[in-house]
């Protein structure tokens, strides 16, 4: 399903939590009603679909590289994400994505899927994130993901923080 983006931002109340769960390959296994409402897609469309069905083309690939690196190493991650709705509108979230572990034993480290909870980001955070993502996307278009990774690495090194610490600093 290819969705053409339009310049129309959707928003939701700051007490709303958008939730999805995916399998190891990123296919949606669960979406809560709030998530289905904002993207304007029902379970028949979402369940079994790749989570990137809602990926907005304005999102830099480096953010997803960080996401998968953290998750596959068993760590949670936070990220600001611009997603696309079925009509091409977009919405911003601050996402907390965690690996889901096999719970057959208290010490299991086997990842069986992923859980994402998203909230409405603050305008202050977006004032920093939007221009950063635009810069990263421009770098990726001219020099690939390595170019945006270089920008992020320099930014994080200059601030002396990890990616997650940077994201949580807003």
Where are the regions a protein language model picked out?
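Sensory/regulatory domains in signal-transduction proteins
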Residues: 2-136
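Juxtadomain coupling helices with adjacent low-complexity linkers
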Residues: 111-170
């Amino acid at each position: 399903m290819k969705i053409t983006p339009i310049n129309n931002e959707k928003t939701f109340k700051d007490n709303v939590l958008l939730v999805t769960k995916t399998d190891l390959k990123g296919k949606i296994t669960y979406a809560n009603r709030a998530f289905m409402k904002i993207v304007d897609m029902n379970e028949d469309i979402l369940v079994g679909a790749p989570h990137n069905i809602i990926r907005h083309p304005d999102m830099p690939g480096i953010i997803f590289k960080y996401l998968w690196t953290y998750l596959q190493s068993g760590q949670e991650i936070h990220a600001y994400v611009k997603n696309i709705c079925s009509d091409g509108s977009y919405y911003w979230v601050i996402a907390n994505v965690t690996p889901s572990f096999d719970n057959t034993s208290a010490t299991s480290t086997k990842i069986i899927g992923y859980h994402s909870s998203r909230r409405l980001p603050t305008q202050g955070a977006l004032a920093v994130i939007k221009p950063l993502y635009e810069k990263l996307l421009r770098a990726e278009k001219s020099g690939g993901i390595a170019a945006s990774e270089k920008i992020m690495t320099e930014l994080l090194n200059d601030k002396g923080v990890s990616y997650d610490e940077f994201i949580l600093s807003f």
